[in-house]
A protein has these predicted regions:
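Short linear capping/connector segments at secondary-structure termini
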Residues: 46-50, 81-84, 125
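A structural motif corresponding to the C-terminal end of an alpha-helix
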Residues: 33-37, 72-76, 144, 148-152
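Single conserved hydrophobic/aromatic residue that forms the stacking wall/gate
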Residues: 162-172
Length: 172
């Protein structure tokens, strides 16, 4: 069995009471402890607001955290539980994920879903499509992710999403 753990990042109000000046150190300390205890992986949530009640309390963005933690840990696999597909363009997200995978020495775990937290969509100006449309977007995004990591000149035109030829990214 392989075991991972989450670092605090604010989404579950797990940084409440920690001053802003000490929040990053709190996250780092948790990551270091997870690594010292020989866990296999470290996880973050892909959310922008707290839950169960949206507040203005700090919530650290997952891809920014994984980028930083890729440089402050040595052996932990790094994952998101799970990336909301419709928060980021699939071509852009593939680029970010590929970069972090390279920066971390191949330690990225890539988990993605269709999204559900309507408050975050609205707060950040994203459309909140029906579940069926979000699932279709996820389906097309997975094709784009695969093409961008395996094809020399990836091109895709779906019902909802498309991509033009772009440089091939590092393999996820």
């Amino acid at each position: 069995m392989k075991i991972g753990a989450f670092v605090p990042q604010g989404w579950r109000m797990d940084l409440n009471g920690v001053t802003q000046e000490k929040q990053w150190q709190t996250i780092l300390d948790a990551a270091n402890k997870i690594e010292k205890l020989n866990y296999e992986s470290l996880w973050v949530y892909d959310h922008f607001h707290t839950v169960p009640k949206p507040t203005q309390d700090p919530t650290y963005e997952c891809w920014t955290l994984m980028s930083a933690l890729s440089q402050t840990t040595n052996k932990l696999r790094l994952g998101q539980m799970c990336t909301c597909n419709s928060y980021r363009n699939p071509s852009y997200l593939t680029k970010v994920a590929s970069n972090i995978d390279v920066m971390s020495g191949g330690r990225l775990e890539y988990a993605i879903g269709a999204g559900w937290y309507d408050h975050e969509y609205k707060a950040y100006g994203y459309d909140y499509p029906t579940a069926g449309i979000r699932l279709k977007m996820l389906e097309e995004s997975l094709i784009i992710y695969k093409l961008m990591t395996t094809e020399e000149n990836p091109v895709f035109e779906g019902c909802l999403l498309y991509t033009s030829p772009s440089p091939r990214d590092a393999t996820l």
